[in-house]
Design a protein with these regions (language model features):
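Structured interface patches
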Residues: 1-201
Length: 201
């Protein structure tokens, strides 16, 4: 027969796609179960372990939607879930939070990682209906001028007209976030074709 060791698995989730400086600890989320008891065939294991259930994109958080994670799929090899709890739900408390929509002008867009030898023109004049969530006391005073938009072109290599996702955030407010996806239209040209000079390698 196999001798098992009883241990506690403490759960956590990781929030991805967070803007610079965002305070993840301020998010009002909770797990349906913070921890469960498991048994492990590895007798020298620690009495507790931290287990990441998975990731949640911050842009998908609207304080209403819940996220489900399967417990057994994240346990270590050989560990047995003793509780009968198969799913952990991550939910959010919307009390004290609200959302607003903003229109952000083109001059608040910063381009990063322009491809070598390319010129980039932003065709979009403004980004409408940008949905922002945050604490009510901040949302009551925040304005469109408080937002910065990052257009990161590190994944772009070819010329042409494309729609590209942007990151919207408020540098002065680290507890607000943008819900959903926002895009701008850009035109990418070879410098040689627009300036009649040779492109730089």
């Amino acid at each position: 027969f196999v001798i098992y060791k009883k241990k506690t698995a403490n759960f956590n989730v990781e929030f991805t796609d967070c803007p610079p400086g965002f305070d993840v600890s301020s998010l009002p989320y909770s797990l349906s179960e913070e921890s469960i008891q498991v048994i492990s065939p590895k007798l020298d294991d620690a009495d507790t372990e931290n287990v990441k259930l998975g990731t949640i994109s911050l842009s998908s958080v609207d304080l209403v939607k819940t996220f489900s994670f399967e417990v057994d799929s994240v346990l270590s090899s050989g560990e047995i879930n003793q509780t009968g709890i198969g799913t952990i739900e991550v939910s959010f408390d919307s009390e004290g939070y609200t959302s607003r929509k903003f229109t952000i002008p083109q001059d608040q867009i910063t381009i990063q990682n322009i491809p070598a030898g390319k010129n980039v023109t932003i065709e979009t004049k403004q980004i409408p209906d940008v949905t922002i969530y945050g604490p009510e006391n901040i949302m009551n005073s925040i304005s469109a001028d408080d937002f910065s938009v990052i257009l990161n072109l590190s994944d772009v290599v070819n010329s042409g007209s494309i729609n590209h996702a942007v990151t919207v955030y408020a540098p002065k407010y680290n507890k607000v976030w943008c819900y959903g996806t926002n895009e701008v239209q850009i035109e990418i040209e070879d410098k040689s074709s627009s300036t009649n000079s040779e492109s730089k390698d």
